[in-house]
């Protein structure tokens, strides 16, 4: 009997629906390129625009593009009627926790339309994510080892192969975001009742991004020196704690800590009380948060209250994460994709929030107090099966803000770059 081969979710989306509705995408023109690909493959693509930033990257002159400028409370009924009238079979968005997308998921489910969410890549760099019914901790995939071990024989690619590199990083995203927000705030009257998922003020972003550039230059030499010390073993035995963006949905929705700051202080308190005296802890600031928030004062205040930690807490900014992953004892995270990077390096990872990869056999399941003394690495066979499942099914080679490789119509094994 021939073994069923699992397909990538982009192919599954393509084969499961004829009439597809796109909601908000990532900043930039990725959804316009996605629509071109879907249309070239015989699909009818509809699009909702919610603000002038959406209009800029996905012009309302495109076929089947609808401007929704009514108030938020009117959206459920509007969407319900549109899905019914146009026989929508799939609803696609970027990020499943945005206000309009939360409603869209419910309405889609009530109307037997599938709901698909794009997200930044689970395995980075060079990947983006597409899942049915939800992403991150809302992913419907089982949190069971046996599921991924059972699926492994069905994968077309069972050995890891490096993806095609694409241009990424902060710069292309920032360029798209700046243009998006300029357009969003330039013409607010067209969408007077629009509710944004982030701070609705252009100055809120431009000033921190400018500060971010200055801080990166300021920390450049220091970060190089820290990286050299790590490689030389100057920090001895250490744990790495990668912080997440302060207002990220991963923090707001998928964990019980009220803030990244509260998570940081909780970890430091546990480390001070339970970690062996000969271990250190490295706190890594998130690069996207560089201009928005700084935790150095909190760390210094904590060390002052816990003098036994003097010289044992290191705060870094732009040192590449792999530098720490090659030498650290383990990682503590809320639910960052950095956890997956740690697991790739066979590093023990302790998750304190809700994460799609927090699975017995992959992450450490003991308490944080126990983790400092007995960190448990992932089961290699299980994690390989887990990783390869995602690379085959949920991950797509590319970057939202520069280039994505879409499969051709005739075969899912070949791909076409879309820039």
Swiss-Prot record:
Query: InterPro entries this protein is in?
Result: Capsule_polysaccharide_synth
Highest taxon listed in the record's lineage: Bacteria
Q: From the record, what ranges are coiled-coil? A: none
Which CDD domains does the annotation name? beta_Kdo_transferase_KpsS (cd16441)
**GO biological processes:** polysaccharide biosynthetic process; polysaccharide transport
Annotated keywords = Cell inner membrane, Cell membrane, Membrane, Polysaccharide transport, Sugar transport, Transport
Q: Which Pfam families match?
A: Capsule_synth
Protein localization: Cell inner membrane
Instruction: Name the principal localization, coarsely classed.
Output: membrane
Give a Gene Ontology cellular component term annotated to this protein.
plasma membrane
Membrane topology classification: Peripheral membrane protein
Protein task: Involved in the phospholipid modification of the capsular polysaccharide, a strong requirement for its translocation to the cell surface.
Write the protein's name.
Capsule polysaccharide modification protein LipB
Q: Which organism is this entry from?
A: Neisseria meningitidis serogroup B (strain ATCC BAA-335 / MC58)
């Amino acid at each position: 009997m021939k073994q069923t081969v699992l397909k990538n979710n982009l192919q599954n989306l393509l084969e499961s629906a004829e009439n597809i509705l796109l909601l908000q995408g990532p900043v930039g023109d990725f959804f316009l390129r996605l629509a071109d690909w879907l249309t070239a493959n015989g699909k009818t693509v509809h699009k909702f625009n919610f603000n002038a930033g959406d209009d800029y990257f996905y012009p309302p002159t495109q076929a089947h593009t609808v401007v929704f400028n009514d108030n938020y409370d009117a959206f459920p009924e509007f969407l319900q009627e549109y899905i019914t009238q146009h026989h929508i079979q799939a609803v696609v968005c970027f990020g499943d926790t945005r206000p309009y997308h939360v409603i869209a998921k419910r309405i889609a489910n009530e109307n037997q339309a599938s709901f698909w969410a794009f997200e930044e890549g689970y395995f980075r760099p060079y990947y983006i994510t597409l899942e049915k019914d939800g992403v991150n901790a809302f992913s419907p995939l089982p949190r069971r080892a046996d599921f991924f071990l059972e699926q492994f024989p069905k994968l077309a690619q069972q050995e890891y192969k490096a993806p095609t590199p694409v241009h990424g990083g902060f710069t292309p995203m920032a360029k798209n975001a700046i243009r998006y927000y300029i357009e969003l705030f330039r013409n607010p009257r067209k969408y007077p009742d629009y509710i944004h998922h982030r701070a609705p003020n252009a100055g809120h972003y431009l000033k921190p991004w400018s500060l971010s550039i200055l801080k990166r230059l300021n920390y450049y030499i220091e970060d190089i020196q820290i990286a050299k010390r790590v490689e030389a073993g100057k920090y001895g035995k250490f744990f790495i704690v990668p912080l997440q963006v302060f207002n990220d949905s991963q923090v707001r929705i998928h964990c019980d800590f009220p803030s990244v700051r509260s998570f940081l202080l909780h970890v430091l308190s546990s480390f001070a009380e339970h970690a062996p005296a000969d271990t250190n802890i490295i706190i890594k600031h998130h690069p996207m948060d560089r201009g928005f928030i700084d935790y150095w004062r909190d760390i210094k205040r904590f060390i002052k209250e816990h003098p036994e930690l003097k010289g044992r807490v290191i705060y870094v900014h732009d040192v590449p994460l792999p530098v720490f992953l090659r030498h650290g004892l383990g990682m503590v995270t809320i639910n960052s994709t950095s956890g997956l990077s740690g697991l790739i390096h066979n590093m023990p990872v302790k998750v304190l929030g809700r994460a799609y990869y927090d699975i017995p056999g992959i992450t450490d399941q003991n308490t944080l107090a126990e983790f400092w003394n007995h960190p448990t690495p992932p089961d290699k066979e299980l994690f390989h099966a887990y990783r390869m499942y995602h690379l085959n099914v949920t991950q797509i080679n590319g970057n939202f803000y520069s280039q994505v490789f879409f499969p051709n119509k005739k075969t899912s094994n070949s791909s076409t770059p879309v820039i």
